[in-house]
Amino acid sequence: MAPQARAIGPTVVAKSLRDALEADTIILAVPFGEHREVAKALPSWKGKTVIDAMNALVPVEELDGLPSSAFVANSFTSAKFVKGFNHLVAATLAADPVVEGGHRVVFLSSDDEDAIAPVAALAKQLGFAPVKLGKLNEGGALVHARGRTWGQLIFQDLFKKEQ
């Protein structure tokens, strides 16, 4: 993974799953089909915040009719679960988020309002402008990439000026 991480940018560091699981906040950025294996790596996700940065390029039938984020959240039942950082390609996320006096937008959604605030703070610390899209099903409708039907905000590289 180290060569792939370096190809994305100098701030991306590859970690083993075991090392990553020691963190309180974990960005889930694996091939979509692997999320269940990651979920099995801990007996309980209590006390952990999981940020789902994946996109499921699978038919909705494979997701039990749920947005991909709600489907994935079912595997991390005791975690604080937030969908975010998924609507832009990795190279864009690795680039400087401050552009022409504005901050690159990242969208966040969660069914747990208490989980969003620390993830929004992390996004700001990284230089992004977090925009809350509501609950997982609301955000999922706006940023999904599924077959030929894509959400209106997927891959939109937006900027927010300081106010």
Features from the language model and the residues they span:
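A glycine-biased structural micro-motif
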Residues: 22, 47, 78-81
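Glycine-rich, N-terminal phosphate-binding loop of Rossmann-like dinucleotide-binding domains
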Residues: 28-31, 54
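Rossmann-fold NAD(P)-binding glycine/threonine-rich loop
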Residues: 53-99
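Active-site-lining helix/loop region of Rossmann-like oxidoreductase modules
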Residues: 104-163
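General beta-strand structural signal in soluble alpha/beta enzymes
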Residues: 14, 80-86, 131-134
